[in-house]
Amino acid sequence: MPSLPPQRAAVLAFLQEQAQAGVSPSLAEIAQAFGFASRNAAQKHVQALADAGLIELLPNQKRGIRLPGGAGRDALLALPVLGRVAAGLPIGADIGLERQLWLDRALFSLRPDYLLQVQGDSMIDDGILDGDLVGVHRSNEARDGQIVVARVDGEITIKRLERGAERIRLLPRNRAHAPIVVAADADFAIEGLYCGLIRQG
């Protein structure tokens, strides 16, 4: 499934909730629900979702939005956005609930427990960009080579994990950034595994 901007993902979640209730909303109702100035903004999101294969549009019908396979609220996850994570130098652990998003389970490889907003460009070669919201599956264990959210001396970062015989390194995916070598006496912990993203804007 393609990455979705948060607002488009929210429109999809709204359509799924309405489908669960047996309702196919009109463009005017979608525009009203999201505070859009006109039906055209709703049409843009609906058409993009249809082009991505996430919904079906029945021609010449005011209420012609259908979900493939009848997906409903069971396909949704309520995910809290818990602050920022550095894709660059580690940033302070300012974890705290910012908001909550309803998102499709199929957006993620693992079931995420929360979302973090990426700050920085050190993971761009893995397709993780500044401003993206990344899904994090809580785990204190990870395999060599996995993308992890890690805590180093009270600060958090997202990097690829490299377990060496004598040391751990957190590897960026941008040649402009240097690896983070975890000192033997560092306060280090794996907070979770990266399991997908949605793109802002």
Swiss-Prot record:
Enzyme's top EC category: hydrolase
DNA-binding region: 27-47
UniProt entry keywords in alphabetical sequence: Autocatalytic cleavage, DNA damage, DNA repair, DNA replication, DNA-binding, Hydrolase, Repressor, SOS response, Transcription, Transcription regulation
EC number: 3.4.21.88
Catalytic activity entry: Hydrolysis of Ala-|-Gly bond in repressor LexA
One of the GO biological process terms: DNA repair
Entry annotated with the keyword Hydrolase: yes
Record: active site: S122 (for autocatalytic cleavage activity), K159 (for autocatalytic cleavage activity)
The organism's place on the tree of life at top rank: Bacteria
Quaternary state and interactors: Homodimer.
Family: Belongs to the peptidase S24 family.
Role noted for this protein: Represses a number of genes involved in the response to DNA damage (SOS response), including recA and lexA. In the presence of single-stranded DNA, RecA interacts with LexA causing an autocatalytic cleavage which disrupts the DNA-binding part of LexA, leading to derepression of the SOS regulon and eventually DNA repair.
UniProt protein name: LexA repressor 1
Annotated organism of origin: Xanthomonas axonopodis pv. citri (strain 306)
Name of the gene: lexA1
